[in-house]
Amino acid sequence: AQIAEKYTVDRIWVDLEKNGKALRQHGMNTVQSNHQIEDVSIIRDSISQAKLLVRVNPIYEKSKNEITEVIKRGADIIMLPYFSTVDEAKRFVDIVDGRANTILLLETIGAERKVDEIIEGVDMDEIHIGLNDLHLQYGLDFMFELLANGKVEEIVKKIKRKNIPFGFGGIARLDEGMLPARHI
């Protein structure tokens, strides 16, 4: 983290998402982090300028405790993955309650179909489009089909109308994955 920060990386991630991820991505060559909640404190103590982004689990019965704990440990930004409904997105933002910035990780068909309601009715700080899980939900063979078939562009047009900062991703390490990132 310190090396990344030294070279002006502005966000350092801790990925706590575990619930349901192994099942969704079973048998695939995907990155599944083994971070623990204690890593939030360790990384927070090792950086001074970069923002600490923590991806938590999708909404579940212990979300309030998990989110409160990562805030106490120093998260600047919290990302909610794999949500499907406006209510889940609202619940997440309500739990965070302005104590950190919020990013919704749009990676389900349910969330994609409700994107208009989400951007109108949820007070998130950013939206990130997750290509990996979204392409799996659509039954596509390759995550970049979402770029080629116009799905990402369609979502982005809606997000841009509301001037919400956004990004998309799912690219593997430089020389890994079905399509090495250096070729993109």
Question: Across the structure, where does each feature detected by a protein language model lie?
Answer:
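N-terminal glycine-rich anion-binding loops that anchor highly charged ligand groups
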Residues: 5-21
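Catalytic alpha/beta core domains of metabolic enzymes, predominantly
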Residues: 101-184
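Short, electropositive alpha-helical surface patch
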Residues: 63-79, 177-184
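Hydrophobic faces of well-ordered beta-strands that scaffold small-molecule active sites
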Residues: 1, 12-14, 52-56, 78-80, ...
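Active-site-adjacent beta->alpha loops and helix N-cap segments on the catalytic face
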Residues: 20-43, 60-65, 82-100, 111-114, ...
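Glycine-enriched alpha-helix->loop->beta-strand junction motifs that scaffold or abut catalytic
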Residues: 7-12, 71-77, 96-102, 120-127
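Short, surface-exposed connector motifs at secondary-structure boundaries
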Residues: 46-52, 69-78, 97-100, 161-165
